[in-house]
């Protein structure tokens, strides 16, 4: 597509064949009305319901306005977003789910917040949700935890509708279930201006939700991971080495105290107790062993961090 693009819209999808024509038409209608030069990047995460065939038909209608990537198998939403971000060239990059629950009508206002108000990232907030209670309650608890841990005052971290300055998506790496924590990744990458806009949420029109307890558990594990990696990911030795050294010193000091105490009692003819009969002795030895192991863990982490290949390698067999 010739010329500079105002907007890239990245749409990760899995088995959403019914909603794709309506979504593409909606995005086109909004962007055409606002005279935005735009592209839509649909990333098919290994769908088995004919979604790719629908995308091929849409490509014939919309031409260069539509790009598409097809994964050979299902890798997850983070993988789809990562590949979409790599392909995006628009000045502002949007993400939205393919299930029609995110409204493209929000695009102009969210873009203005980035372009005119200077935000690096604007996240949607679905204040009034049309999801089942079993999805809303865990989501509320998750958002509270993420807010507390990160210090970012967002009400809806997991909203699929987000707007980014292009430099943000080109500076972060998402994998696992990290798509939930892109605002946290952006903050730790140095992008401090993170805003929120209340958006209209719609009930799912086609298909069924892919939400499940397994995803919730993985999300919490990734929250721990992203917090740790943001602080120590570049140098694991800072964490493991420091903790290991502290444990080793504590164990060594305790051992010296036990030995010194025994010598003192021998010199002064005081009652002695066998070192092996003292629980403190075993705690000291345990601390020394743990200290050495933690130090070695930090060293191995450094080696892996310095020599690891790119973790985001996904097999794609089709591109449009």
Label each PLM-derived region with a short phrase.
Residues 16-19, 47, 77, 103:
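Donor nucleotide-sugar binding loop of glycosyltransferases
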Residues 18-22, 49-58:
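Acidic helix N-cap motif at the loop->helix transition within catalytic regions
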Residues 24, 36-47, 69-70:
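Short beta-strand/loop segment that forms part of the nucleotide-sugar
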Residues 44-53, 100-101:
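A conserved acidic beta->alpha catalytic loop
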Residues 57, 69-73, 77-87, 92, ...:
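Acceptor/aglycone-binding surface of glycosyltransferases and processive sugar-polymer synthases
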